[in-house]
Amino acid sequence: MASLREEIESRRTFAIISHPDAGKTTLTEKLLLYGGAIQTAGSVKGKQSAKHAVSDWMDIEKQRGISVTSSVLQFNYQGKCINILDTPGHQDFSEDTYRTLMAADCAVMVIDAAKGVEAQTIKLFKVCTLRHIPIFTFVNKMDREARDPFELMENIEEILGIKTYPMNWPISCGKDFKGVYDRSAKRVLAFSSDGRANGVKMVDEVEAELGDAALDELIGTVNHEKLAEDIELLDGAAEEFDLEAVQHGELSPVFFGSALTNFGVEPFLKEFLRLTPAPLPRKDAASGELVDPCSEQFSGFVFKIQANMNKNHRDRIAFLRICSGKFERGMEAFHLQEGKNIKLATGTSLMADDRAIVSEAYAGDIIGLFDPGIFSIGDTLCTGKKHVQFAGIPTFAPEHFARVTQVDTMKRKQFVKGMEQIAQEGAIQIFRDLGSGMEEVIVGVVGVLQLEVLEYRLKNEYNVDIRMQSLPYEHLRWILNDPDELDIKHLDLTSDTRAIEDMKGNPLLLFGSPWSINWAEQHNETLKLSEFGNLTF
């Protein structure tokens, strides 16, 4: 029977990030395929089939072929228990992605070989660098036309400001793609796929050494010569591999492959598991000390809440990242924010919308806790006499705003419940005019597609039709002043500025332009504004 330390050190918990359509969900499913968690991978946008991506569980995700919520996927591979946090790639869902990255110990960055680093990748990468977690790069779609690999490496280093080390090297691309050269093993893995096995089985990979005469026949003489030149150049000029730099997020190992055809996925997975750390210590915000993952004391934090994963039961699940110790079904833990002990009667493992009861889980694991309405994003749970509280994370200021009311006033109860539950998940933020109720609310979102998702979910999950009116505001700022030192109603503001409050009564200001923000700051000397709200945990 494995010890507590052995169980925890076998865990690997990472997030997969990318720009939309770079192949993130496809790579996720191929990792599951190699891990034996699934037998057939779904086609994310397949029109010929009724299959859908395993990690895309919400109806709207299956219809649109995009990920709009974060999924948690767990499987075992070669003695390691792997937790994948599959994050939304769509640019309108970056806030959920941000919180999910707080639960990861490292990240895999998927890049489209034809496009290089894109806008969404930059934003998510910056979140990773704030935490100094290891970042691995998978350059995808090498079986299609792609940019020069040297150009791609330079692109990553210049735009993201991180050094790179290619773990393998591509041999041509597109229709002429022949495979990759494994720099560590000093051998060629030849690309071999008939194109009909995509998503159904694992492809064979043919091995051959550089300089072997058989390589001329396998990849062609011209490709063989070009590969030899490239490797000589890399060995002489490229950054040296430094595992310590990797684990501090200063050097990104780069792998080339094709997730759709399964090529390069298993070699990537093996190297990734070899190089990535076991669960990392987390800082206790109260004491400033690091919490040892292998401590006997259980601790964890809620980083996500999802309502209606099972529409038949109108449930709410709190996603908990275990930071130390061991979870046992039926255990009691201290809920820091509530100030009392609660019984954790049931924990569930999470494979998108499929759930199974778990009797135990360890630091590094993500479990789902049934939430009767007591949990919020950022809550800390712990055991032991010394309570811990994990550091806070900011909330992004929304950039799009709309006034929302229900069409049928008789469905006010369902409307309020739906709005509050969806807001508690963190996909939207809801506000109201100072001192008003929930007759009409102001919804703020990071991207406009979230408004469409809100309308869809209220109709589909709560049977509520809504009216939505766009508001002419683009910026939101939290007011940091204490209520007794500032009278919000008497601030000197422009006509396109609006004073509102969030659902906890915290005051905020909506602005129509940056000029209006400057006016407010210049004409109200004591006013303190912030671009970020704060969730403390």
Where are these predicted regions, by residue range?
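Structural and coupling elements of P-loop NTPases
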Residues: 1-537
